[in-house]
Amino acid sequence: MYKITLIPGDGIGLEVTAAMKKVVEATGVAIEWEEVIAGEAVLEEYGSPLPDYVLDSIKKNKIAIKGPITTPVGKGFRSVNVALRKELKLFANVRPVKTFKGIKSRYEDIDLTIIRENTEDLYAGIEHQIGDYAGESIKLITRDASDRIVDFACKYLKDNGYKRLTGVHKANIMKISDGLFLRVFDEVSSRNGIERLEKGEAPDKVYADDVIVDAAAMNLVLNPEKFDVLVMPNLYGDILSDLCAGLVGGLGIIPSANIGEDYAVFEAVHGSAPQIAGQGI
């Protein structure tokens, strides 16, 4: 018997987590669900959308699955997703993107994974208001976090039988921050035995390459079947993983895993969609 923390979430969260439980039950795996509430439903009572008892439950059970939780735009409380990743040190966001039989999409043979560094970059939340005339956000990229996420991506690639590891960056413009990420990408992929191809060498083995983020966006639309595992800083991963979801039918069919050394939280990628909650859609 496995014990897993279940966070239903806001909006359609109650419906999608109920459906998820039925699917899991159909597999025959014995799971005891420990349900805890987070999000808008507890904000007034606890003064936070993420009460301590939620974190305590996840730390006890080591694994959680959650429905979507509403995040206010431009005001209000900070994202619960971001807080969970920070508090539990869930450094890797993993989003497999595959075409599914029976689901209409523009492509038939996509099988790739976006691996996103989860703890820093512009999503570290280091922001400052400068009077009424400016706002400042700090882009934080560290060697340790970059090393950790690229190492994770290398192991993921090998464990899942993929060949191509692609580092995504904007080092042509952000030469210090993204430049550091790219240097670490080369060091760590080489350390894991994943080398760049020599000129003219056929890609018949595992290999590494890199692509600037805007070129990655274009090529993911033009030739998504050519990619396997892409690893990148936080912001790029957030944007490109949603783009990839659009290639195979939308956010509603894409899973997401947030993984750390000690804990893992699995979730739906889509939002809470309060406008359709309770309609059985």
Question: What is the role of each PLM region?
Answer:
Residues T5-A26, G131-D214, K226:
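Glycine-rich phosphate/diphosphate-binding loop of Rossmann-like nucleotide-binding domains
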Residues A30-Y53, L220:
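N-terminal beta-loop-helix "entrance" segment that forms/cooperates
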Residues D10-G13, K62, I115, A153, ...:
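Buried hydrophobic positions in well-ordered alpha/beta secondary-structure cores of metabolic enzymes
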Residues R85-T99, Y207-D209, I253-V269:
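Short, acidic/small-residue loops that bind anionic groups at enzyme active sites
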